[in-house]
A protein has these predicted regions:
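N-terminal signal peptide c-region/cleavage motif recognized by signal peptidases
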Residues: 4-6
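Solvent-exposed N-terminal domain segments of exported/luminal and surface proteins
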Residues: 13-241, 248
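Charged/polar interaction segments and conserved charged motifs
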Residues: 10, 49-52, 60-62, 118-131, ...
Length: 365
């Protein structure tokens, strides 16, 4: 849970020495599990699929020839309830009779990072610490800040400043109403750059983790709008956190946008989610108390190349749920973090539980 006052201590040199031995350079368990359903970490990374064109932006599924190991559906989901998140269990309870199912494929653990990132992560294990009630990291280099986490907030910071490489993304956002009809709510171009990973030898300090720009193209009422967000790499204390600006066509000027955060409804998805729902979670952790539940084997979405790169979004939007054939599920070890709204704080959600895969530290549920 969240420590107050003194800094949360880094781990000992003896503990940090496990990185690259029984733990991967990023702190995951190197070995597979007892029954072989989770393999050992693959330090070679994901194989490049035949036909991939560098710089094309279109990644080809390297596992396209694989078949599901098994399918979880209305007839058997309760046998797997222990390894399903509450969200997927709820989907079976509500939509199992309508054909909701999960195709579970072989697990792949090909998450790798540059050597300098591993070296910085090793230094961070003994050198980085949380201060200011978990709102700030001191002593971290551009790498994973807490490969051997001692608290819930250390786990969440690993997700919040996870590794990224610059990219552009054209995307469409749809929401499906209660009538089962999809409605286009946004067409946009998103550009993300990651300044803190461009200076690997310098402490993060005030260097941003990411700078995000979104140019809205549709619907017509939003065409021409621009959103710019600078997200900190180490410091959410007062005056140091997220900086956001908006350009609104009708006003013809750029203005600060402090409301682009927390539980403000996100117009990019027609207000059906909050700004801090994006990427499962983002932004300052200040409004919640955080509890580390532990690590557990669970079935989570992973390696869904078909969904992201091959299929048209509109073809995958069912009346009640996404096309199950487009989603790939795998068994992974995940960190589980629970959060409860602090007394005196305001948020649409009073409690949130997050699931982060051990290899990438990315929140997946």
């Amino acid at each position: 849970s969240l420590a107050t006052g003194a800094a949360l201590a880094a781990v000992s040199p003896e503990e940090a020495a496990r990185l690259g031995k029984d733990l991967t350079p990023m702190g995951a368990e190197m070995a597979g599990n007892a029954d072989g359903s989770i393999p050992p970490w693959n330090p070679e990374g994901t194989k490049v699929a035949a036909g991939f064109v560098p710089d094309s932006g279109n990644y080809i599924d390297p596992y396209a020839d694989e078949k599901p190991l098994y399918t979880i559906d209305a007839s058997n989901w309760q046998e797997y309830a222990e390894v399903l998140t509450p969200g997927t269990r709820a989907m079976f309870e509500k939509y199992g009779a309508d054909g909701y199912r999960m195709n579970v494929y072989p697990t792949h653990r090909g998450t790798i990072r540059p050597d300098w990132y591993y070296a910085n992560t090793l230094k961070n294990a003994t050198g980085a610490s949380l201060v200011a009630d978990g709102q700030k990291i001191e002593g971290n280099l551009p790498g994973l800040p807490f490969p051997i986490p001692q608290s819930a907030l250390e786990v969440m910071w690993n997700h919040m400043i996870r590794y990224g490489e610059d990219f552009n993304m054209d995307y469409d956002v749809y929401y499906v109403g209660s009538n089962g009809k999809p409605v286009l709510s946004t067409t946009a171009l998103s550009t993300s750059v990651f300044p803190m990973f461009k200076t690997p030898d310098e402490p993060v300090g005030e260097t941003p983790w990411t700078m995000l720009r979104i140019n809205y193209k549709a619907p017509a009422r939003r065409a021409g709008e621009i959103l710019l967000v600078h997200e900190p790499g180490a410091d959410y204390t007062e005056g140091k956190g997220r900086k956001a600006w908006q350009y609104l066509v009708g006003q013809r000027r750029v203005r600060l946008a402090p409301a682009v955060s927390f539980d403000t409804p996100n117009p990019g998805v027609a207000g059906t989610t909050t700004y801090d729902d994006s990427f499962i979670y983002n932004g300052s952790p200040e409004r919640f108390d955080w509890t580390l539940i532990g690590k557990k084997e669970m079935i989570v979405p992973s390696n869904s190349y078909k969904f992201v790169f091959e299929n048209k979004v509109e073809d995958m939007l069912g009346e009640k749920f996404l096309d199950p054939e487009a989603i790939r599920w795998e068994k992974h070890r995940v960190w589980i973090v629970d959060s409860n709204l602090k007394e005196g704080s305001r948020h649409l959600y009073s409690r949130r539980t997050f699931y982060l895969t051990e290899d990438s530290w990315t929140a997946v549920a």
